[in-house]
Structures are given as C-alpha cells and as structure tokens.
Swiss-Prot record:
Positions of the Protein kinase domain: 490-754
Catalytic residues identified in the record: D612 (proton acceptor)
Described function: Functions as an E3 ubiquitin ligase.
Keyword Secreted appears in the UniProt entry: no
Catalyzed chemical reaction(s): L-seryl-[protein] + ATP = O-phospho-L-seryl-[protein] + ADP + H(+); L-threonyl-[protein] + ATP = O-phospho-L-threonyl-[protein] + ADP + H(+); S-ubiquitinyl-[E2 ubiquitin-conjugating enzyme]-L-cysteine + [acceptor protein]-L-lysine = [E2 ubiquitin-conjugating enzyme]-L-cysteine + N(6)-ubiquitinyl-[acceptor protein]-L-lysine
Designated gene of the protein: PUB52
EC number in record: 2.3.2.27, 2.7.11.-
Annotated ranges, domain U-box: 774-845
InterPro entries xrefs: Kinase-like_dom_sf, Prot_kinase_dom, Rossmann-like_a/b/a_fold, Ser/Thr_kinase_AS, U-box_ubiquitin_ligases, Ubox_domain, Znf_RING/FYVE/PHD
Region spans: Disordered: 180-210, 229-258
Residues in coiled coil: 351-468
Protein's recorded name: U-box domain-containing protein 52
Length: 845
C-alpha cells in the first residue's frame, strides 16, 4: 500500500507533460526474457517509422562496496578514487550486459541511447525519465507471479506511475499482454488485458441473451463493493481476468470471475437492507468471529448455510452467495478481509417479496447452467493455454534459430571475406616471388657481363699502360727548374685556380704564356689521372679541347695554353666584375661544347667519356671560344659499347654533384649519355646563370608560361629570343631525363638543334655589328703579316703560318719575334686557332 501511495503521488507530480519526443523507451531488467521485450518493440515501431530508441536499465545506487574479505564498506568511508573506480567497473559490467540488446538495435539500423538509472525505486526512476524526456511510448516486461506470491507487481507500478501522456505496452514472452493507453489515445481510460499465453485465461465467453439480466444483477451488487487493489488483482491466479476501466467520475470498478466453485449471485428483488444486518442474518456469530475461522471451517460453514438456504422455502430472506474468504488460505488474511467485504456487499439484498421461492428456483437453475458453461470454458481454456504455450515455445525457438542463422550467415560472410583476402594476398606474394626471381636472374646475368667486361678492361688497361710509355706520345718536355722559374717558384699572385687534384699557375715558358697544373704529390690515384690526361691530350687535337703545350712527368706538371677569359663558371657568375656574356655567344658555346663531346665519344681506337663536364671545366679564350679541360677523370670504353651498351665501373662514381648522371650514381654504370646529362645542366645554366642545384625543376615549372620563363632568364645577357630560348631550354630538359634511354642522341639530335640555334645567334650578332670588322690580331702571322692558313706553335711560344715558319727555320735558328735562339725546331699544330680562322672566313663569305 505504501508503494501504491508513492506511485500515485509521483504520477500526480508528473502530470504536466513535456514536449513530445519521437523516441520509444524500452525498459528491461537484463534477464533472459528481456530480449523478447526488445524484439517486440523493434517489430512494432520500426514499421511505424520510429528510428530513435532509448534503452532504460534501472539499478540500485552504490552505497556500499564489498571488500575481498566479504565485508561491505560504506561509500562515505572510502576515498573518492576507489569509489570512482568501483563505479566505472559497474558501468563496464552494465554496458557488457546490455551489449547484446544494443546489437539487436544496430542490426535493425536504428539509433539507440542506453540510459543507466540509479534508483531504489524503479517505477519512480522510469516515470521521472519519461516525464523529463517527453517519450510517448514505453515498452516494459510483465512481472509474473503465482497465486500465493506477495511479490510486488512491478509492471503495474510502472504503468501507474508513468505520466498519462505516455502509452505503456506490457510484453510477456514476445507478445502484447496489456496496454495502458495515453490520455490522447483513450480519453483517460486504462485497460489491462491478460492474454492466454501469459495468464492462462481469456475473456469471459459471450453468454446467451437469457443470462444478460443475471449478469446485470451481479454487476449492480459489485458496484457496492470496494474495488480490489492492483496487488489483489494479480494475486488471483491464472484463472482470473482483471479489467479496470476509469470512468469520467474517476471511480474504479473491477469484475472478477473464478472457475474454482466461486459463484456470484445477486437477487433481483427490489428493496435493500443494511449489509451488516444481512451478514448477521446469514452468520449470527459476527464478522470478527468469521474472520478468525480457519479455511476448512469457513468452507464447511459456507456449505451448511447454502443447504439451509436451499431447503428453507418459507424463509423471508434467501440469498445465494459465495464467500471470498473461502478461496484464499488463512495465511493471507488481507485477501480474506477484502473478500469478506465483498461478501458483505453481495449479501445486501432487497426486501423479501412474495415470489421469493420462484426466484430462488430460477437462480439455482441459472447457477447450474453457469457452472456447466464455466466447466466447458475451463476445458477450452486449458486446451488453449497448452496450444498457446506450444506456440510460444515454437516462436521462441524460431526466434533463437533465426538469430543463430543470422550469426552463421555473418560468420560465413566474414569467412568468405577472409578467404578472399588470403587468396589475393597469396596471388600477390606469388607475383612478387616471380618478380624477385626474374630480378635475381637478371642480376646474375649482369654480374657475369660485368665480370667479363672487368677482365676485358684489365687487358685494355694493360695496353694503355704500355702505350703510355710508347714513343707515340708527343708533347714538349719541361724540367722542374723551368716550370719553377716560369711561375716565380709558384708565387701566390700567379695562382689562377685550385682544385681537388692540384693548383693552376700562370706561367711564361719560352716567351709563351701558359697555365701549368701541378698535381698534389704522393697520391697514387692522382698519378693515374696525370698519366691518363697526358696520354689523351698528347694524342688528340680539337679546336674546343684545351691544347697541351708540354709536361713534366717527374713532378706531375701539365702545361696548357693560357685562356684569357677564364672559366665559363666565373663569367656566368660575374666573378671580379667581369662583363656578362651575350646570349648569342652562349648559343655558340653550347654548340662548341657539344661538338667537343662528340669528338671525344667518336675518337679512335676507343671512345672517351669526360665524366666531369661542368662550367668550371669549360675555359674561354680572349674571343670567348670555349674549350674543354680537365680530362683527368675521363675514361675509355670499347667501340662496341658506345651505341648500345655501357661499361661497368667497380669504383664509386666520380665527378661533381648535380652534374653526375643519376643512373651512374645509382648503378656505377657509365655511358656516353652520362656526358649528355651534364651537357643538359650546362645548357640550363647558360640561359639562367643560376647554380646547378634544383635548376631542372625550376626550368620545368617556368617553361610553360612566358612571363615565368622570361623571369628565370639571365637578363644581363641581352634580349633573349623567347621561342628559340624556349627550344634551347627544352633541349636541356630532355638531356637531363632521369633515365638514359629517354635522353636524345648527341650526334643525331642535339648537334642539329644547336647548329640551327647557332645560325639564329649569328644573324643576331651580324645585325648588331655596324661595320665589317677586320681579322683579329691573333689571326695575323708575324712573318706574313696576314691571316694564317695553317697556324702552328713554335718553340718560342708564338704562332706562325706553317709554310712561313718552316722557310724561316731552314735559314735561321732564332725566333722571328724575340730574335733569341730556339731550343728546338719542333712545330705543334694549333687546331683551335685554325678552327677559329676557318669559322671567321666562312662568316665573312
């Protein structure tokens, strides 16, 4: 009764409804049968368009915490971190328990919010949550108990406590057991109906018309009896059907029928007497004495009074009544007391009339017929209950089997997906293994080819060493004393350059200005480079290769012709405030460098690869004629390897960073196209005058836009022709491709393109020349006083026409210029000057 008062007070407190919520609340207790409640809610409300659910779970608040010794300690006596950890453990356990229910919502692809409510009063907590959120649909499970149970009917308490704007659905074993409609659905009426699958009974069968008056009389008698409490309704066992309707006046009425020999008979005689007097007439001992009787005594007394009423036809007061206390055991005094009050109401009968005997006879007849109908109804009900139980079990089994089938299908899909991934991984592994196998075979083949080439190179090296000491090497031999005197004992003011392999000094040997390179002493590698450079420069001649005047092999000194304008790198970077090189001269320099590379690559008997081409190794004479120098890092390859194959070098890559072929850096394999890569970088520096670092990327980004492209060009070189300069830049980018096979051929593609650009530069240069100029002074022979036809260098260091100097030497042993004795009469052809003279003559024509 106390709980009922609390529920009623809470219901009145929560009577004002909040804004309605589109959610459906499902309250569970976490037991096995809770899944039927969730399943019913999903099947019911998802087709109606509800996609937002709230899962309510009420648990008692934490007031004590158990210890490992089994002692419960109050929360107030423990630290906050211990209490917090214990609560987190409880939250984790609750979430793990609710996980299967959340999966049921997730499989149906609907939103679910899990709410953990801490309260000692589940009905009050759920009602407060419904009132706060405005949920209009609540689904709960039925609280089942036996006839003699005193357990609280929690479903009834919840249905009573929940605000009136919410409809409550009570579920039992997956089926709807009862509904408490909201005020908007049923105008304030609340109706509980127990289905046959849960309570074992159905609604009373419809009686024939002749029994309607009888039932009306029974209802009138019951209206004077105080209604049962919800606890009494649910304690009446599986053979009771309780129906509660709330009328407009708010009065509760209950109709109860039983099939255990209990009968309700109301006489139709008009006139009423006091119920206490009626009960005293039927039981003179009094109400208190009757309530104190045992179950057996009450039943026997009930039978005696029934026989007395049947046999006494002259009695003024005949009432057939079933005593409610005879049904309930003596242990449940509160049920007996309530039943006695109902009996008191039923014993209030009307005044005795003259046709009392006939009415009693009719009542007995109706009682017999009603008993027969009830027996038939009980039999049908028993069969219905059995069938309903079987159907429920079958439905439950079908539901479990369907869940297992869904799980098996999910496992099957996961297994198929895993198998597919494993198969794909296996195929990829097999393909990778095949690739590795092919790479290993290619690597073995390359290794054998490299070993073969290494042996061949060793033989070629031996031949080269033998040829270095052969008499075929032609160069002027200088002593160490002569070189020291020519450089003023290597004075610092005469030093014009220094590198990784030696220093370069300006010298004057035999009245000839030259440049002597002195290699660092004591290094075997430098000795090899000296011998290689001496051999190459002493045997080959080209207008765009630096001319070797002589050497001192004992001290590692090489004497070159002196280049007045220094290196291309110094002129591009304007070192010492030197004037910039015009753009048309740069076009010509690119062609000259390319022609020198073609000459080296096509030399006989073996091609030569420079390997260290950069602006610092491109020297300029007083007419800006370019010549390649520093061939000490050059290497020779076999003639068969020039066009299609490369040579494998076992040493680490040599050269200057940013100019080295990327494939040569990565593999150590050198080829003529390694020089092509360096040439491409030099071309890009000619047009931009910028360092080699990232120059390829910079030109690639700007070449597509005229404004950006003009911005990266060297503006100090003059007015660049945009289309021709872009063509030269594109050629430089092609030369700097990462893969050798993507680079153009030097002779067949690069040289023709540069020759066409040189013609454009020559036309521009001729337009800038106002008056035709005469031959340069160094073209004039000191003997002939005219342009030389075949220039050559004599022992005094001056250049003469060959015919004129030979005629002079046949007659005299002195120099035509200095008039000093000549140390020898050897003549060295000056091919560089010869090429310049021929070019000047062709341009003049």
């Amino acid at each position: 009764m106390e709980e009922k008062k609390v529920v009623r007070a809470l219901s009145e407190h929560l009577s004002l409804p909040p804004p309605p919520s589109p959610s459906v609340a499902v309250a569970i207790n976490g037991k096995k049968k809770s899944k039927y409640v969730v399943f019913w809610a999903l099947e019911k409300f998802i087709p109606e368009g509800f996609t937002d659910f709230k899962l309510l779970y009420v648990r008692p608040p934490v007031s004590y915490i158990p210890t490992p010794m089994g002692i419960a300690v109050a929360v107030s006596e423990l630290r906050e971190d211990v209490v917090s950890a214990y609560k987190q453990e409880l939250d984790w356990s609750a979430n793990e328990m609710l996980r299967p229910y959340k999966k049921m919502f997730e499989r149906r692809k609907v939103q679910v919010e899990v709410l953990l409510l801490d309260s000692l009063e589940p009905a009050a907590a759920i009602a407060e949550e419904i009132a706060g959120t405005g949920v209009t649909k609540l689904v709960i499970g039925m609280s089942l108990r036996g006839f003699f149970s005193r357990k609280i009917d929690m479903s009834s308490l919840i249905a009573t406590a929940v605000p009136r704007f919410c409809t409550v659905y009570v579920i039992s074993k997956g089926k709807l057991a009862s509904v408490r409609p909201s005020e908007s659905d049923a105008s304030g009426s609340i109706r509980f109906e127990r289905s046959s699958s849960t309570s074992g009974s159905t609604d009373s069968p419809r009686l024939p018309p002749e029994y309607q008056d009888f039932l009306s009389a029974v209802s009138e008698a019951q209206s004077r009896v105080s209604p049962f409490s919800p606890a009494l309704k649910h304690s009446m066992g599986s053979n009771a059907v309780a129906q509660m309707d709330t009328s407009s006046s708010g009065t509760d009425q209950e109709e109860v029928s039983t099939g255990r020999g209990m009968e309700i008979v109301h006489s139709g005689i008009e006139g009423k007497k006091n119920k206490d007097e009626s009960f005293s007439a039927s039981f003179p001992m009094g109400t208190e004495a009757y309530n104190s009787m045992s179950w057996t005594s009450k039943w026997r007394d009930h039978e005696d009074r029934r026989e007395m009423r049947s046999s006494s036809s002259s009695n003024n007061h005949d009432l057939v009544n079933m005593d409610w206390g005879a049904v309930v055991p003596e242990n449940y005094s509160w049920v007996s007391h309530t039943a006695s009050h109902m009996s008191d109401g039923l014993l209030s009968v009307h005044s005795i009339t003259d046709n009392q005997v006939n009415l009693n006879f009719e009542i007995e007849k109706l009682r017999a017929e009603l008993k027969h109908v009830q027996e038939m109804y009980a039999m049908a009900q028993t069969e219905t209950v059995g069938a309903s139980k079987k159907l429920t079990e079958l439905n439950q089994r079908r539901f479990e089997e369907s869940e297992k089938l869904v799980e098996l299908k999910e496992k099957e899909e996961v297994a198929k997906d895993t198998a597919s991934k494993e198969k794909q991984r296996y195929e990829e592994a097999m393909k990778e293994a095949e690739k590795v196998k092919e790479l290993m075979m290619k690597e073995a083949l390359h290794r054998r080819e490299a070993e073969f080439k290494a042996e061949r190179d060793a033989r070629e090296k031996d031949k080269l060493q033998a040829s270095l000491v052969s008499p075929g090497v032609q160069y002027q031999h200088y002593t160490w004393e002569e070189i020291a005197a020519a450089t003023s004992d290597f004075a610092e003011n005469l030093k014009i350059g220094i590198g990784a392999y030696g220093s370069v000094y300006k010298c004057n040997l035999h009245h000839t200005t030259g440049a002597v390179k002195v290699l660092h002493a004591g290094e075997t590698q430098l000795s090899k480079q000296f011998d290689q450079e001496l051999e190459i420069l002493s045997k080959i001649r080209h207008p765009h290769l630096v001319l070797l005047l002589g050497a001192c092999p004992e001290r590692g000194c090489l004497v070159y012709e002196y280049m007045d304008n220094g290196s291309l790198d110094d002129r591009l970077m304007l070192v010492n405030d030197t004037p910039p090189i015009p753009w048309f001269e740069r076009f010509r320099i690119a062609l000259e460098v390319a022609s020198a590379l073609v000459f080296l690559h096509k030399s006989k008997p073996r091609p030569i690869i420079h390997r260290d081409l950069k602006p610092g190794n491109i020297l300029l004479d007083h007419n800006f004629v370019s010549k390649l120098g520093d061939v000490g890092l050059s290497t020779m390859v076999n003639q068969d390897d020039v066009s299609s194959r490369t040579i494998f070098k076992q040493t680490s890559p040599v050269g200057t960073l940013c100019y080295i072929d990327p494939e040569y850096q990565r593999t150590g394999i050198i080829s003529p196209k390694s020089d092509v890569y360096s040439l491409g970088v030099v071309i890009l520096q000619l047009i931009t005058a910028k360092p080699a670092i990232a120059i390829t990327h910079m030109v690639e980004e700007a070449i597509g836009d005229d404004a950006e492209f003009m911005a990266i060009l060297d503006k100090k070189a003059g007015s660049w022709p945009i289309s021709d300069t872009r063509e030269l830049a594109a050629l430089g980018l092609c030369c700097t491709e990462m893969r050798r096979r993507d680079r153009p051929d030097l002779k067949d593609q690069i040289i023709p393109a540069l020759e066409r650009l040189r013609k454009v530069a020559d036309k521009a240069q001729n337009l800038l020349s106002r008056t035709p100029s005469g031959p340069p002074s160094h073209f004039i022979c000191p003997l002939l006083k005219g342009v030389m036809n075949e220039p050559c260098v004599a022992a005094d260091g001056y250049t003469y026409d060959r015919e004129a100097i030979e005629e002079w030497l046949r007659q005299k042993d002195t120099s035509p210029v200095t008039n000093l004795p000549l140390p020898n009469k050897n003549l060295i052809a000056n091919y560089t000057l010869y090429s310049a003279i021929m070019e000047w003559k062709s341009n003049k024509r």
